[in-house]
């Protein structure tokens, strides 16, 4: 759904394009199933059983009926190495046979967790990092970031320095803290969120929010000034951290305008505010660099990782902590007797073994280099179809990440009625042709596995073009009915 101000919201899809349940739903045991499904409305389950994916192979997935789909969203922007990488399966199997689980509490741990922490510190080169804390997801990583920041400021005798600044349209997860950080109203509605410790500043979407005649650099300057004014209004002594994705991902694939991060970093540094970079989507090659911080010259104090960390073969997330922060945490834990934060599965040996092998593959195969090699074909192919479409307002992307936003007359302000479900229509047209995309209201996003070939990109682009034409025809019908 798109609000009058253009803020993207998660939606359950168009009512008119759901496929009614059939006999196969009973056969496969999915009709009236027992799951409380994430980001799914009850009516969807009632009229349409879930699409059950049974197996994967490379960039493709297969449902229980044997239908093959090109997975143009890599699971949820996560299966970077595709769905059948034998080295990851082998790493998991060997670790399961050797040591399926042991914890990392009370000065105990396992070899895979130690090795993975060392490898992550080595791999992240945007600035020096000191320690790694393991979680099970990106949501947990961002949730833990806030606790670490609070702990750090308490240790320094700054109990008032607790508020976190995030951005509208951002997505940082769905736990209490990470959903509060997220700038999407749907994640807050009737969950009594966001928490009072979160402040939201401007979304850096130039196309939608720039003033008439304003250049990208001028837009970035205005947003940096707005951030500084927010800090001064609240009091710099109350602001602990600023969190941002290098490219806003699940909130609509929003790229930073020119000079944005240069100016934002100058502001937060001026007021002794920590910079948390959320690399959950952009980490490990998605943008054509190993990390988004490399592409946009971000020098963070803390980094959140997940998704491609294990190519989603096993649940795992991580936080990279700067030496300055980790030194304070160590000193304060000595004073208190412990650093009392962690999860049963922090540093799970199987997840760490899989992630360690994934990192080796990223380096050995130069996955960021491959992304750079094929990204132009991907970006230009999609944009060529979108440029001539009367229903596409903007197509934006970098590397193997792209979004198409549907608006009328190519205007950011002439929005299609939500009930038309234009994005969902496009998504269904893709699915009919054997391709999965991510639908977010009147926007669709694509983020294929990073191993995608030029031939597979050509197929993806071809399906995109066919689906776009079919969607244009459907929108024309809806317009004629409206008139």
UniProtKB/Swiss-Prot annotation:
<dbReference type="GO" id="GO:0005737">
    <property type="term" value="C:cytoplasm"/>
</dbReference>
<protein>
    <recommendedName>
        <fullName>Probable gamma-aminobutyrate transaminase 4</fullName>
        <ecNumber>2.6.1.96</ecNumber>
    </recommendedName>
</protein>
<dbReference type="GO" id="GO:0004015">
    <property type="term" value="F:adenosylmethionine-8-amino-7-oxononanoate transaminase activity"/>
</dbReference>
<feature type="binding site">
    <location>
        <position position="278"/>
    </location>
    <ligand>
        <name>pyridoxal 5'-phosphate</name>
    </ligand>
</feature>
<dbReference type="InterPro" id="IPR015424">
    <property type="entry name" value="PyrdxlP-dep_Trfase"/>
</dbReference>
<dbReference type="GO" id="GO:0009448">
    <property type="term" value="P:gamma-aminobutyric acid metabolic process"/>
</dbReference>
<feature type="binding site">
    <location>
        <position position="171"/>
    </location>
    <ligand>
        <name>substrate</name>
    </ligand>
</feature>
<dbReference type="GO" id="GO:0009102">
    <property type="term" value="P:biotin biosynthetic process"/>
</dbReference>
<dbReference type="InterPro" id="IPR015422">
    <property type="entry name" value="PyrdxlP-dep_Trfase_small"/>
</dbReference>
<dbReference type="GO" id="GO:0030170">
    <property type="term" value="F:pyridoxal phosphate binding"/>
</dbReference>
<dbReference type="InterPro" id="IPR049704">
    <property type="entry name" value="Aminotrans_3_PPA_site"/>
</dbReference>
<dbReference type="GO" id="GO:0034387">
    <property type="term" value="F:4-aminobutyrate:pyruvate transaminase activity"/>
</dbReference>
<comment type="function">
    <text>Transaminase that degrades gamma-amino butyric acid (GABA).</text>
</comment>
<keyword id="KW-0663">Pyridoxal phosphate</keyword>
<keyword id="KW-0963">Cytoplasm</keyword>
<feature type="binding site">
    <location>
        <begin position="138"/>
        <end position="139"/>
    </location>
    <ligand>
        <name>pyridoxal 5'-phosphate</name>
    </ligand>
</feature>
<feature type="modified residue" description="N6-(pyridoxal phosphate)lysine">
    <location>
        <position position="307"/>
    </location>
</feature>
<comment type="similarity">
    <text>Belongs to the class-III pyridoxal-phosphate-dependent aminotransferase family.</text>
</comment>
<keyword id="KW-0808">Transferase</keyword>
<dbReference type="InterPro" id="IPR005814">
    <property type="entry name" value="Aminotrans_3"/>
</dbReference>
<feature type="binding site">
    <location>
        <position position="307"/>
    </location>
    <ligand>
        <name>substrate</name>
    </ligand>
</feature>
<keyword id="KW-0032">Aminotransferase</keyword>
<dbReference type="Pfam" id="PF00202">
    <property type="entry name" value="Aminotran_3"/>
</dbReference>
<dbReference type="InterPro" id="IPR015421">
    <property type="entry name" value="PyrdxlP-dep_Trfase_major"/>
</dbReference>
